[in-house]
Swiss-Prot record:
GO molecular function, one term: GTPase activator activity
Family the UniProt entry places it in: Belongs to the IML1 family.
Region described as Disordered: spans on this chain: 1-55, 688-717, 1166-1185
Topology within the bilayer: Peripheral membrane protein
Phylogenetic placement of the source organism: Eukaryota, Fungi, Dikarya, Ascomycota, Saccharomycotina
Matches recorded under SMART domains: DEP
Record-given protein name: Vacuolar membrane-associated protein IML1
Signal peptide: none
One Pfam family named in its UniProt record: IML1
InterPro entries: DEP_dom, DEPDC5_CTD, IML1, IML1_N, WH-like_DNA-bd_sf, WH_DNA-bd_sf
Ranges for domain DEP: 1077-1152
Amino acid sequence: MQHPRMFNQTSTNAKKPNGSDSSIKVANHSNQRQMSANHASLTIGGSRNPINQRRSMSTKNIGSTLIVSRRNNHYLDMKEEDSKENLTKIISNNQNEEDTEVSVKVSVWFHELRDFTEDIIIDENVIPTGVQAGQVFELQSLDEGSSKKFVFTVQKRNLRSATNDTDYTEASKPKLQISLMANPFQRLLDLAPRSQVQLKRLVKLESVTVDSVEIFIKDVNLSRDAMWNFSASMIGNCVYIDQRLLYLGSRVGVTKHIYKNGKNVTSGYVDKNTKIIYRSESAKITLFVQLSREMWHFEEDGEIMFHKLINNLFPKIFRRWRETNTHHSITIVLFTSIDLTDIPWTNLGPGQRPPQRRDFFRVVVDQVNSMHWDRIMEDLRLEFANFKRDTMLNLDDDGKFIIENGTLPAIKGNLLEAVNLGLTSLNNRFQNTDLKHSISHIMVITPGTGLFDVEHDLLLETSKKMSSVDSSLDIICLSQPPLHVTPLFRYIKEGKVCHCVPLWCDISFFIDKVQQESQWIPRCKIYELQMMGVMENEASDARIPRLHLNNYGKTLVEIMDEYDSAVFKPIKRIPKPAQVEFKQVKPKFQAPELKNATATLSLMFENKPLLQPSNSSTISLATGTVANPSKDTSALSSLYYINKNSEEIKSPAPSVRSETPVSTIRAIDSYRKSAGSPRLIRGETMFKRKEEIPNTEPPSALSEKNAASARKKSSILAEPEQEISTGSFWIEISNPSQETTTNVLQRSQSSRWSNIFPNKIQRKLIKWRSFQAPASLPTTTGVFPSTNQLQTDYTFQIYTVFLNSDNYWELKSTHSLMREMIQLRLMLGFQVCYGERVDKAEAERKPSGNVDAIIKYFPEEHNYLGSRIYLAFGDEIHRIFCDYNGNINVQLYRKIIENDEKKITLGQTKLKPYFPLIRTRYTDEYTPARIDAIADNPQKFNWNQFDQLLAGFDDAMPEEKKQFHKMKFVVMPTDIPKNAYFVSNEKLTPEEIRVEGLRKLIGVIERGKYKHDSSQKKKSRRGSDVIFYTGNLYDFLNEEAQNYDITGTQPALMIPESSRFNKTIKLPDLAQELQDRNTGLTLVDRTWHFKRHLHCFVGSELVSWLVDCFEDIETREDATTYGQNLMNKGLFKHVESRHGLLDGHFFYEFSDEYVDKTDREKPSWFGSKKIDGASTPQSNSSPRIAGQNDLQKIISASNLRSETSSTTDSMGRKRKKFILSRSVKFDVDPLKKSFRPEFVTVHYDRVHNPEHCYHIRLQWLNATTKFIEDTITAWTRLCERHGLKLVETPWNELCSLPKLSPFHSFVDIKLSVNPWTDPDLCDDRILSSNRYYYHSYFLKQMGYYLDNRSTSFFSRENIDIGYSWGKPTFRYAQFIHKTGFYIVELRDNGDFFLAPNNMHLTRVRSSTTLVGDYENYSKGVLADSQTVMLNFRAACQNKEFLKETFTLAKSNWKDDYFSQII
């Protein structure tokens, strides 16, 4: 059938004036030339006759050749005897130019980035039919021996006419047909400029569609929902090697590998079935090194295991990281397990471990950049030399060191315990957000052979955790690979030794030397042979007879050749004696009898009434109520017996005869419906012959060659095969020596990580790519339960979500809501399910099942109605469906907790609390961990609450659970740069520059508020809403409270619209208005650094007043100019006569001739005042300055005499509550690059002392992290220009970090001189006013700024302090070093708790934009950070220095020098 658009064109040209017809026609163009018969001929098959020799064609170049419907691989290959009818059919199809593959010969040009920003520029007329956006072309060199092909999709921006440099190209490159970016295409395609290439338009894209694409990302935290959206944007486009990819206008990654049919290709086309894999070159890697007994053994070549690690493996890994310029954050931990029993470990049986063990973990480096490989190697060698001594020596009662037993071998070690300990920092997905690193990866290096004895319960618990986090695990073995399948876990269950291969980890074997296939490698260690010398082999007592191979022995090469030849042989049928037949077996689980035919779950069947959402009592509406399945109803029971009649339900198994033993039947039945822990994929076949028949085949019941045939022949075999292939944690192996790795890999496709492996690619012995760039958990998966599993193993719940038009997330349509619901799940670990099982489950749904409506990626807005998507995570499956009325239905399937699992999770657990001994980086002793690594489980979420929250119902989730992604920043003083902010004709002090910079930063935040309508603009743009003060915060707030009247109302600054002024007002009148107590400025006595300025105002407040009250002043700049004119006329002046009018925190006073004398006679704010009968002494702190109307004070209406009231103090006085921070919905995407609103909640302090840290906190749920990172970078640059430093710090207090991250380094430090007990320093006047005066003075001398006050500070007398982000809960006062590298806590007993600020260190080391030489700069940062810690610890231990410092502090003491902070 012809395309309608082309049919009219062809019909017009079909007939000539003379009535003759033509076989093939091409649309005429304006510039045509007649071609010779030989040139214009089209040869098809063996036909020698030219077709329409007088045909006219249009070409761009004279030498161009037109080939119609021809492919390189000769899809069109017709013989001479082909009928004329077939030929006519082909020619008729070619009349549709849209479906015709056209090839031309062109010259390729190359351009630089300065010429064009696009990778490809193509002329629309390069082919006669024209080039249109969306078409796919293939470019191939005509040089012999060059097979590289480049496939690309034409976008509108790639067309030559769409470029802005058309005139330039016409002048410099008039014959340009196609131009490629010189870098990388010239190297990638190995083409010289002006080379002749063949350009072919492709119609059938199957030949160029790729199977998988690997994208490497670096220095960006690309969340999984962003990966899903990014993958969706790539569908329908082409990719090529080393292509730089952009997402929402920002560069996020580079295409490194493209696979098709098991081969690496240069480029290809991406469709919805292409697997897109993301690997991170800036990951967080936790590397465990197991120092078991074998680590001190040596190989057959004499190399000690640890030397093999430290001299071979680590250097190669670091070298690859350095060559690829990766920016990983590395944590290296040494661990081992010490046997405390007197039983030799060799007496332990398979699967057994010593009952009494002591585990040790030594942190070598903690979140250090991978560039510091030299320092890491040095620390590793040092720690290895001391590790055995530190772990095996123990003090006895007599104070002597004794050796406690020995180190366990790797097979009996604590591998799973180490994995659980590494997962503790990953269980909470919302804590410690890192915007520079994507993906967390765990690597375990062991000297073992890949066989580990474990406890079954611990293996199950670890498997559950690994299936609930998106972190991968690599095990690297230093030994030779064994002859059995690996990794192999061995455990005892019900008295039986079991073997299994976990699906959540991968294993590698490091072999340094290249070995030949014929070389024999010993797999076992014989001590006598290892200790023999070269000349001792004749005299040795060990006599080992030579191994004589039997005649039937085959080499590995022969076995592989035999396997390859057997692949294409016909499938063998199972012999007659091997057929299995069974009696009728009644299944354990049957469809329950439905007592109520109108129940919700029963409404979905053919024989039941259709589902009625409007009147179903169990379907949630806006309130989010979920359906509670009955006690008798397991899983989907009634829901998923769909399209089946009652007979099928009652008898799911076919009728068979009784030729199989009863034990086998019981085993099958038990296997199908086992209540055991995980669904185990068994390596052996489930059925055996009744009579064993000798056979030369391998000793398995059914070989792999006829297993497929057996499954096809028997439905009883096929169904269990479907059931056991999903939801599994491991593959059970009956005989590890007989199981091949290939078989295990084929059955391991049920792993949720299976999509990262390209099809038909041979797995290598060591996975260097995984070490170089760990892979992210794929956003899609083919793993899905069978229909039978959904019926029996899952419970079902349903609720409906409606969009509230007034919602915080600015969602305007159900389309946006559904997309956000999917993205939130992907971000928290879910995967999109696809495949035959998903289609089957959807097809059997009644009445709304529609396979064609299942989506893998989100559709366009006009196509989303009726779409449904399946997502899976752990033991949950979510089906999100948008009906045609715009309502979103969410159906949740949760796996039933089976009996063995209930014993662990609900009853008395078999797993003991696990608190191993950990020694962090800077500590000297091993101390017990502060977190139970095994009991700590990943965070679970109430998805009904989440969905209702996204829909706009804020009360659906409690406030304490709304702590999502969060970051905390502090702004600290630093050196003034040379290009610092300045004001013309003004000389600002460093403090004034910093204060102005802080005001500008808050101004940027205020101006960046998310706007619903960008056209709405307010005339009045008030300045920064920050109140500056010096001295004691409590005294300042107490005086602020005195200035509020008893009702809590404040005088309005704005005067009525009818009383607005203009610039014609006279100075005396303006002076009177400015000094009016109700509508004028606030004239108070202000103190700054112990110097008092009477009756003054702030410059920024005057500017705001002028903007608000003058009708002819529109901007703050106009107000500043007008105010300067007033100052020049003598209306007011600077308090120190140093500045003109500046829109900032500068003090001014009225000239004497304009001062209102009546106002001066009134008492000052700083005089003694009475409030509720209590006197408050005069203070040196400054009062409110600007924006005071937003500083909230809440007076309780409760009984003033109530001692328990939170708003009254012990004396019955009314307590004033102050909110010292303000929250702003900040737009991080002001240029609207994203398809959705992108904003975060910013909390900033409204009260600030320039000598302390200023706080900015960010909170968000679903914003794109790249926009947040760009915003923080812009803030950092602004701060640097004003002598400020923006430093990221932990959200929680420092003392809680060891509970959140057990490997985080910290140091407990005591002062060698205690100022509280030293007779020369103990002064009652000082200690009574401020107990921690000496400690504060010492910290200030060491360069530390106050970060957070202790909670006790905020509960004093009649002041109640809160923040917009919540109530402060810091137990101790916290200080940050001026570099931002270290944080110190001041404990109640006067000791210090010091820890590195890893967040800031990671951010600084990852900021490659700061300097060009990244490696040297990063190493300098590491040296500086360690120097800070070493200097502080040395100062605390130096008695002379402390005595001198404390003596100086005592001599400089003043009553108000330091504020009370504890």
